Structure formats: C-alpha cells, structure tokens
From Swiss-Prot:
Expressed by the venom gland. SMART domains: Knot1. This is Toxin Cll2b. It comes from the Eukaryota. GO terms for cellular component: extracellular region. It comes from Centruroides limpidus (Mexican scorpion). GO terms for biological process: defense response.
C-alpha cells in the first residue's frame, strides 16, 4: 500500500515538473512572436498569459517569446504544415 502511494506521488510530481514549453506562435502567419529585450520581458509574459492562461509564464529567448508552464495540448511554434510567411 505504501509503495503504491509513493509511486502515485512520484508520478504526480513528474507531471508537474515536465510541463510543456515553447515559442508563442501567431496562428494566422505561423511566425513566432518577436521580442528584443532578452530575459525577463513584460511583453512576452503578458502575451503568454493572454494566449495560454494565468498559470503560464514567459520571457524573451533568442529574440522570440518563450512560454512556460503550458498545458500539454498547447499549440506552440512551429505549426504543422504552416511556415512563417510561406518560407
């Protein structure tokens, strides 16, 4: 019984730690949201929260808004069968 409880607790913890992350994407163009102030960035944080909910985080990484703490079905860049501006 104790072993089952420990396994369940570990699986719940792993699910929490391994949340999805990725670049914020514009669904109409297929492009990443650009940013220029690397690191903590109010713009990226605001856009990630607006698109993915209050629990999401965001910062500027490699000149694109990187969102954290996303739900597993969240759509992030790159979009399947859609390239940025047809490139």
């Amino acid at each position: 019984m104790n072993s089952l409880l420990m396994i369940t607790a570990c699986l719940a913890l792993v699910g929490t730690v391994w949340a999805k992350e990725g670049y914020l994407v514009n669904h109409s163009t297929g492009c990443k949201y650009e940013c220029y102030k690397l690191g903590d960035n109010d713009y990226c944080l605001r856009e990630c929260k607006q698109q993915y909910g209050k629990g999401a985080g965001g910062y500027c990484y490699a000149f694109g808004c990187w969102c954290t703490h996303l739900y597993e079905q969240a759509v992030v860049w790159p979009l399947p069968k859609k390239t940025c501006n047809g490139k």
